[in-house]
């Protein structure tokens, strides 16, 4: 009986703690500059989540630098009380941990709260290119080894990884096509438009308007067809189901050792956000696909992403 009473008291205490949190504003660290995908996604979360957080404000703070590592470390070292949280991205928790051997944190040193959204990727060519499908692109690369090129935003970026992984899945080597590195995702799209390169893979929001205008031709999209460009096949439909692993994403994480009641409160908040029209509309407007998951599912997803990019970094020989 004493054991049962103790267990009930513990449950009651946890429930009370969950209801009592938060009792003050929450700082939401965005580890990238204002105006980018991470910033917009974080602010959409903040403005819509606070109504389910005892009306306590979520205050976005941009701590950019070192490809997201500075802001990420800030949260890694924060007090585990639930009042400093992180907008985690594919760069901070998959690519950087795989790429940087001396990175000061590991991807799994955080409390996972929820995956938030997926950000589709599109592989594409110029609108007037003779290549009309992924299979035709593979044939063109194979027939002209070392002569075709693709645009990336840098060696360790998801744009580079996406094109390299596509060639790997097609049975090509990294030398079959040449990567040309630009300064950002916007320049990647522009490079294809200007015929500086033959193809690229990039975040959907910068590509969709050009596809709709006919100036770019999308070969496939990950992870599924998009309503904005419904005639563009998914990667699986184009014959490359493995490319569905190449997708941008956002998650909410906290420092290691967050109390269980804080994790449970956020699980409840995300269940409400999943039905919240304001969050849904903001997410769709920013080109995201809602992907709310449990903490355990989020950890499994992030682990799979890290393992994928760890393999790619090793294959490309670019680990630093």
Predicted ranges, named:
Residues 207-275, 304-307:
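C-terminal lobe and pocket-closing loops
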Residues 18-109, 147, 171-201, 210, ...:
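N-terminal (or domain-start) structured segment
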Residues 1-10:
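Sec-dependent signal peptide recognition
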Residues 13-17:
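N-terminal signal peptide c-region/cleavage motif recognized by signal peptidases
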Residues 23-25, 212, 237, 260-320:
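An extracytoplasmic/periplasmic, membrane-proximal ligand-sensing/linker region
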Residues 77-84, 90, 98-188, 235-237, ...:
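Hinge/capping helix and adjacent helix->loop/strand transition within the periplasmic-binding protein
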Residues 91-100, 164-171, 198-233, 310:
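A ligand-binding cleft/hinge motif common to bilobed small-molecule-binding domains
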């Amino acid at each position: 009986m004493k054991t049962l009473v103790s267990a009930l008291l513990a449950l009651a205490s946890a429930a009370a703690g969950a209801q009592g949190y938060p009792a003050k504003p929450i700082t939401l660290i965005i580890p990238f500059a204002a105006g980018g995908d991470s910033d917009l996604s974080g602010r959409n979360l903040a403005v819509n989540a606070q109504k389910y957080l005892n009306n306590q404000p979520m205050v976005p703070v941009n701590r950019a630098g070192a490809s997201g590592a500075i802001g990420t470390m800030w949260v890694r070292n924060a007090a585990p009380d639930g009042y400093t949280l992180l907008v985690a991205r594919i760069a901070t928790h998959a690519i950087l941990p795989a790429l940087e051997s001396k990175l000061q944190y590991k991807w799994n040193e955080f409390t996972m709260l929820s995956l938030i959204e997926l950000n589709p990727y599109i592989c594409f060519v110029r609108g007037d290119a003779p290549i009309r499908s992924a299979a035709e692109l593979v044939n063109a690369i194979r027939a002209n080894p070392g002569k075709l090129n693709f645009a990336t935003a840098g060696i360790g970026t998801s744009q580079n990884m996406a094109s390299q992984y596509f060639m790997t899945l097609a049975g090509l080597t990294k030398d079959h096509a040449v990567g040309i590195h630009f300064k950002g995702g916007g320049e990647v799209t522009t490079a294809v438009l200007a015929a500086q390169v033959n193809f690229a893979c990039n975040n959907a929001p910068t590509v969709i308007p050009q596809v709709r205008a006919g100036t770019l031709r999308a070969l496939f999209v990950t992870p599924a067809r998009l309503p904005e460009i419904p005639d563009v096949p998914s990667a699986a439909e184009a014959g490359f189901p493995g490319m569905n692993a190449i997708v941008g994403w956002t998650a909410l994480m906290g420092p290691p050792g967050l109390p269980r009641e804080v994790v449970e409160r956020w699980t409840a908040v995300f269940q409400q956000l999943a039905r919240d029209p304001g969050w849904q509309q903001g997410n769709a407007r920013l080109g995201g696909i809602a992907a709310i998951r449990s903490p355990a599912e989020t950890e499994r997803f992030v682990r799979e992403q890290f393992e994928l990019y760890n393999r790619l970094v090793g294959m490309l020989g670019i680990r630093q």
